[in-house]
């Protein structure tokens, strides 16, 4: 079995994206497999888990009743990934058809009933955290909701060095890779949907420059790797940064590759296994409804799909 056959012999969420990104399949064939995501496999399972209150696990960012005793979760402590925000974000990553009846009904329930734990604000109105707001912009664009107000807030929160930081409201003046990639994904989606303004485009470009001038994973001052964990690839991506996530961002933006990503691409190539696959390396800890791969250290259909389409973009555009 070839690597492509291995990916095609999978859940509709992987199959349709592999057909679109790695083959010459017809538009009709791709659309037919994509339509299955809402009715079969992972996508259908997630939709079925929405509660009668219109939320997943009874909450927006966190499940009902969950609290962190020492503040927000970090990269190692984990958090539940079963609430509304991570579930909708996973449905986006699965590429579920936002126009399907099942999805429209689910998103309408979120818009009507889900409110953030912070200040009891409506879900698609955003809240005060830049990472959360960036992801909510991406979700709003994908699922056809009005998120103009969140975009305006994010534009006003961009830091002098070009990025964003969730802790800027507590006085931090230095950008975070994590916050920046989440906001960039939202702004890029907003722009690709035709809603971008001169101001949002300029902000997006400044944010990209923040990553590019650091070669996606290095300190600007010394050239040292910022965090070795970012060299290990995760899926689902959740909120943390890693190099493959950044490469996927630039691929989706569809601009010609900037030479400053060359080192990141070489890292990606170095991780291909002798059988042609890439591994799942850094699963973010926390409760999930069900796994999407076989675990860290095992071949990952998701990371293989993502790596191959990055390399296809990089090789086809450079």
Question: Which positions does each model-derived feature cover?
Answer:
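Preference for long, amphipathic alpha-helical scaffolds in soluble/luminal domains
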Residues: 1-318
